[in-house]
Every structure is written in structure tokens, then in C-alpha cells.
Design a protein with these regions (language model features):
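Elongated alpha-helical scaffolds that mediate protein-protein interactions in large eukaryotic proteins
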Residues: 3-47, 53-58, 62-66, 72-96, ...
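Amphipathic alpha-helical repeat scaffolds
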Residues: 37, 53-54, 99, 128, ...
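Alpha-helical solenoid repeats of the armadillo/HEAT superfamily
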Residues: 23, 61-73, 106-129, 158-189, ...
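Amphipathic alpha-helical segments within extended alpha-helical solenoids and repeat-rich scaffolds
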Residues: 41-46, 52, 88-105, 117, ...
Length: 499
């Protein structure tokens, strides 16, 4: 068999396309040179992927073109794609160069740019795989210009989003870029904190996400990813400021949450809003700009599980973190109390946790007589409600990471009941709590409090957003109130309005 025939056969088997012969001739020439100049083993160890990576890092255009052609073909070939992507993933310099090639402007570099554009779709796929590893996320964030280029891929014109027959490769590049950014902003620990800030500090990030939300009705998958990214970013205080400061984002999230025909889409919007409102007066003010927002949230409380859960989360955070100037308006949420109390009586896990938490916030706007009246409206009496709270504490004898604030919210509500009870009603809830063994329960809880119960949310195992008052201090206050058996208005957990 002649050398040319052999090269043609290898090119066909490697699926190197029309430029296969040129690429292979250069490969074997370099392998031969390695054998002559060094050891024969140097030439034998060479492979096409490493060879191509070396070429795209070259300063010569013809070598760069050969390299990018080889990588493009190998990375799209069914037989070699997996191994090629795995090998490329260990060399950030190659990915950086491919990204850099997109910015080349000279006419003679047009083919390189075209190959690089196709290759970058694969590059985003590589980055997505790399981002599954915590250490790699840090490397992606530190690679010069790489994060900015990933964000650049999230920019998409309204025409493309509104066109159902738009190029699949264009849509896929936006999708993969959003997937990579989502993985970066959900990275745990100090690396994640730095990445969330880096993503937020890019002036194009939030405006690009806004464009997807605003025009992506035909691309719901992209909208979901955009909202996932916003939720992850909102775990950082400075990122929240950037999101709220970008016009129209909160308004779009509210519109999607209240009007989305697709449940999952509405759920993503609700999660983003709840995270934005957590410990952020500015975010709460932005949400309250919508005139009917409280009515809409109240009507969503008894919706299906996820929608009702997120409505409660948003409403609780609005009550807890809005400025004093919104107090009068927020007091209207008391009309939702029967629905919230009903969720406490029948709910489980997260629904139960947030319903009790919302109750503690609504109680800031009522006195004990009004609260008792709301119990009646919900078809309950004092004993049934207190028995439910006692039952929750007995069920959750130890803290649970799934519902880290469960016991905190219940003890806060118990403290409010005791603080608000008057001597005129003979001790009211205090006597009832004593009768049902609350002292023994609280003493047992005091022995099992955990640092887990001092935070709002977690990024992996890393806590985010610490409560102002420790849970152990709240338990101690409740025990003191129970022992005193008298009105101690203004003391303890009932006064922790923004816990």
C-alpha cells in the first residue's frame, strides 16, 4: 500500500474530513522530527489531540488553522469525541486560545474564526463538564478573559429568541453558556462566593439574563436557566444589588411567577424572588413597587405545592425585611392568616416550616385577640393550634438540614404567644403550653441546638445569611417566659422581626 493510500485510510478512519491529508502529513512529519531530534519514544508518544493543541497555540496562522481543523473534526466525531473532550478539558490554555480566536478580525483569519466558532460550542460543552468539579470552577473563574467570554455567549437578540426556526447551534451556545454560569454561581464555599461576585460584576451578565426573560417565551428552557442563574447570584448581597439595580428584572420575575402557564417556569421565578427578598430591603422595595403584589401572593398561598411554597417564602421575606415605611401596607397580609394557619395544621417539611415562619411575621401586625379571631376563621381553637406546635417539636427533636429553621420558627411563635398573653385571660397560652409539657420539650431542645439552625440557607454545606439572634438564645427566652407566666411584651424571640 502506498503512503498516500495509507494516509487516506487513516484520515477516513479518524473522520478528519477534506483537510485530513494535510493535517496527517504535518503530524507524521513532526513525529518523525521528534524521533530524529530526540528519542524514538518522543515520536511514538505523540497523539493527534496533543499535536493539534500545540498548533493552535502557535504564532503562525497556517499552523493554527491545521490545529483547529483537527480539534473540530475529532471533537465532533462519534468515535473520538469523548476522549478528545476529556483530554482538552485538562488544558485550559487550549480553551482560552479557542475563545481568543473568536475576536480575530483579519480577513485571512476568517476560516480560523469559523472553525473556532463551531469549536467553541464544543468548548462550552467541555467547560460544562469541567464545572462539575469544585477546583475546576475556581480555575475557570481565574482564567484570563474566560468568564467574560462565557457571559458574552449569553447575549442573544430578540429576533433569535422569538424565531422558532432559529439556528440550533446559536440556541445551543446560549443554553450551554447559561448552564456553565449556573454551575459556577452554585459553587460552594469561598470559591463560590468569589465566582458569584465575579459574575455579577460583569456589566453584561444581568442585562443579558433580562433579555432572555423578556423575549424568551418561545425558549422556556433558556428562561428557566436564566432564572436559575439569578437565584444563585442572589445568594450574594452585592449581586442582589446588581440584579435589583438592573431595570425591569424584578418586574419580569413577578410577571412570570404570577402568569406562567408552565408550572416549572413559575416555580423558578418564585425561587429567584424569594432569594432576592431575603435580607434585602432594596429587593423588597422593588417587589412592592407592583401595586397588586400582596393580593397576588395571598391568592397563590393555597396553590399547588411549589407555587404556594414560594409565595409564602416571598411574603415572609417581605414582612421581615421591608422598611418601616411599608408597614401599613404589609399589615393587610393578616387576611391571609387562615390559609397560613391551615398550612401549619396540614403541611409537611418545607411547607410546614415556611408556614410557621410566615405566621411569626404576620403576628407582628396583630394582637392576641386578633390572632385568636384568625384561629376561629381557620376553624381552629387555641388548644388544637398549640397541640400542633407541640407535635412539631416532638417530631423534630433534632435539627434537620432539609428544614433548618423549623424549630426556630416554632419556638419563636410559642414565645410570641406567651409574650402576647395577658393576665386578664388567666395566663392564656402560657397555662396551655405548661399543661402540654412545653417546659420539658424546650429543655430537651436546649440540649440539641445546632449552628445549622442559625442560618437561612446553605450552599452545599456552607451556610449563607446568619440570623441576628442565636437559636439557643431564643430557646432560653421561651423558657424564661414559660417560667414567669406573665406578660413580658417586647422581650425575646417575638421581638426578632427580621430573623
Amino acid at each position: 500500500m502506498s503512503v498516500c493510500k495509507l494516509l487516506e485510510q487513516v484520515s477516513a478512519e479518524c473522520e478528519l474530513g477534506p483537510y485530513g491529508l494535510v493535517s496527517l502529513k504535518r503530524f507524521f512529519y513532526d513525529a518523525y522530527s521528534q524521533c530524529i531530534e530526540g528519542s524514538i519514544f518522543d515520536g511514538i508518544k505523540m497523539d493527534l489531540v496533543t499535536f493539534a493543541e500545540d498548533l493552535i497555540l502557535s504564532d503562525f496562522l497556517d499552523e493554527q488553522l491545521i490545529g483547529v481543523r483537527i480539534l473540530q473534526q475529532l471533537a465532533t466525531s462519534k468515535g473520538s469525541a469523548r476522549d478528545t473532550l476529556r483530554k482538552l478539558g485538562t488544558n485550559p490554555r487550549s480553551i482560552e486560545r479557542a475563545v481568543e480566536m473568536l475576536n480575530w478580525k483579519r480577513h485571512e483569519e476568517e476560516e480560523v474564526r469559523k472553525c473556532a466558532a463551531e469549536f467553541n460550542l464544543l468548548g462550552l460543552h467541555i467547560l460544562k463538564k469541567l464545572a462539575r468539579d469544585h477546583d475546576n470552577c475556581g480555575k475557570i473563574g481565574n482564567a484570563r478573559g474566560l468568564l467574560a467570554k462565557i457571559v458574552e455567549f449569553t447575549h442573544v437578540s430578540p429576533t433569535l429568541l422569538l424565531n422558532p426556526s432559529a439556528s440550533d447551534s446559536q440556541v445551543r451556545s446560549v443554553k450551554r453558556a447559561l448552564q456553565v454560569i449556573k454551575m459556577l454561581v452554585y459553587t460552594t464555599g469561598a470559591t463560590g462566593k468569589a465566582l458569584r461576585r465575579d459574575v455579577a460584576e460583569n456589566v453584561f451578565t444581568v442585562s443579558n439574563l433580562r433579555g432572555v426573560l423578556q423575549h424568551g417565551h418561545q425558549r422556556m428552557e433558556l428562561q428557566k436557566l436564566a432564572m436559575d442563574v439569578l437565584t444563585g447570584m442572589a445568594m450574594d448581597e452585592r449581586a442582589k444589588e446588581t440584579i435589583v439595580g438592573t431595570g425591569g428584572v424584578v418586574k419580569l420575575l413577578l410577571s412570570i411567577f404570577f402568569n406562567a402557564g408552565e408550572c416549572e417556569l413559575g416555580n423558578e421565578a418564585g425561587e429567584a424572588l424569594a432569594m432576592l427578598a431575603l435580607e434585602s430591603e432594596a429587593s423588597c422595595a422593588a417587589i412592592l413597587k407592583r401595586a397588586d403584589v400582596l393580593d397576588q401572593l395571598a391568592s397563590a398561598l393555597d396553590a399547588h405545592h411549589a407555587r404556594g411554597l414560594n409565595a409564602m417564602r416571598v411574603l415572609r421575606n417581605l414582612c421581615a425585611y421591608s422598611g418601616e415605611e411599608h408597614r401599613t401596607r404589609l399589615s393587610t397580609v393578616t387576611k391571609a392568616m387562615p390559609t397560613v394557619l391551615g398550612a401549619t395544621m396540614t403541611g409537611r417539611d418545607k411547607i410546614l416550616e415556611v408556614s410557621v415562619g410566615l405566621t411569626t411575621q404576620i403576628c407582628r401586625f396583630v394582637d392576641i385577640e386578633q390572632f385568636t379571631a384568625e384561629l376561629r376563621r381557620a376553624g381552629l381553637n387555641e388548644r388544637a393550634y398549640v397541640e400542633r406546635l407541640v407535635g412539631i417539636l416532638r417530631q423534630y427533636r433534632y435539627p434537620e438540614i432539609r428544614v433548618p429553621r423549623m424549630r426556630r420558627f416554632v419556638v419563636q411563635q410559642i414565645a410570641w404567644l406567651m409574650t402576647s398573653s395577658t393576665r386578664r385571660d388567666g395566663g392564656g397560652f402560657v397555662d396551655l403550653l405548661r399543661e402540654l409539657g412545653m417546659r420539658q420539650l424546650l429543655e430537651a431542645i436546649a440540649e440539641t441546638t445546632s449552628e445549622v439552625e442559625c442560618y437561612h440557607v446553605f450552599s452545599g454545606s456552607v451556610p449563607i445569611g446568619k440570623h441576628r439572634e442565636s437559636f439557643s438564645a431564643i430557646v432560653d427566652t421561651a423558657l424564661q417566659l414559660l417560667a414567669a407566666g406573665q406578660d413580658t411584651a417586647g422581650a425575646g424571640a417575638g421581638g426578632e422581626s427580621v430573623s
